[in-house]
Amino acid sequence: MHYQPKQDLLNDRIILVTGASDGIGREAAMTYARYGATVILLGRNEEKLRQVASHINEETGRQPQWFILDLLTCTSENCQQLAQRIAVNYPRLDGVLHNAGLLGDVCPMSEQNPQVWQDVMQVNVNATFMLTQALLPLLLKSDAGSLVFTSSSVGRQGRANWGAYAASKFATEGMMQVLADEYQQRLRVNCINPGGTRTAMRASAFPTEDPQKLKTPADIMPLYLWLMGDDSRRKTGMTFDAQPGRKPGISQ
């Protein structure tokens, strides 16, 4: 996406990023901060979150807060408690990026481990729903709220061996569409399909792939910025490709 935002695009915006300790989430948090946002980091690895917060502080002079939440084990009550803690320190949320995700096993349906399947659904669907439900009151206090989910090409067209991950991303697309319809005038709700990107999750899915042939998280940030800023204000209920035209599968 060719998009050149103004440097103050996200001034006065408060944006929460899940999975903010690594990969795309880390890059998104740093990018949002660079463009003026107050960023809230969410993840399960405190040391990594501290490093990201320190990096943002060094670059922008603003110290982001971070919160620990393990999506694999969290309950609805945990999510509500987190939202209450956030509400003590912040009057609203202008954006939430659901970036955290679990890949699971890439193998035929006949070989899918039922517990791994449950884990993928817990992280990618159940916890994402519970966290969204808890954060909605804060998002609805914004006059320009943007809720962004992370999808995948296998969440639109199922492909062999992508079992639990594909099913979870179909569910993500559905959750986005339902929320967009419920909050048509009050909240933008969309999905981003990042496409093949140079991350640890990608390497585990395609261990033989040359990472140098992939876009970096920084390369795909224009779309992540656009969906959080005012330039996308009328877009809702849609799914966007960060790498339009890219063929799914291993990079050749």
From Swiss-Prot:
Q: Report the active site residues.
A: Y165
Coiled-coil stretches noted in the UniProt entry, renumbered to this chain: none
Specify which residues bind substrate according to the UniProt entry for this protein. Answer: S152
Q: EC class of this enzyme?
A: oxidoreductase
Q: Which InterPro entries match?
A: NAD(P)-bd_dom_sf, Sc_DH/Rdtase_CS, SDR_fam, YciK
Q: Name one GO molecular function term.
A: oxidoreductase activity
EC number(s) per UniProt? 1.-.-.-
User: Which amino acids does the record list as binding NADP(+)?
Assistant: 16-40
Per UniProt, which keywords does this protein have?
A: Oxidoreductase
Q: Hey, which family's this protein in?
A: Belongs to the short-chain dehydrogenases/reductases (SDR) family.
The record's annotation in PANTHER family points to: ALCOHOL DEHYDROGENASE
Q: What is this protein called?
A: Uncharacterized oxidoreductase YciK
Organism encoding this protein: Escherichia coli (strain K12)
Taxonomic placement: Bacteria, Pseudomonadati, Pseudomonadota, Gammaproteobacteria, Enterobacterales
Name the gene for this chain.
yciK
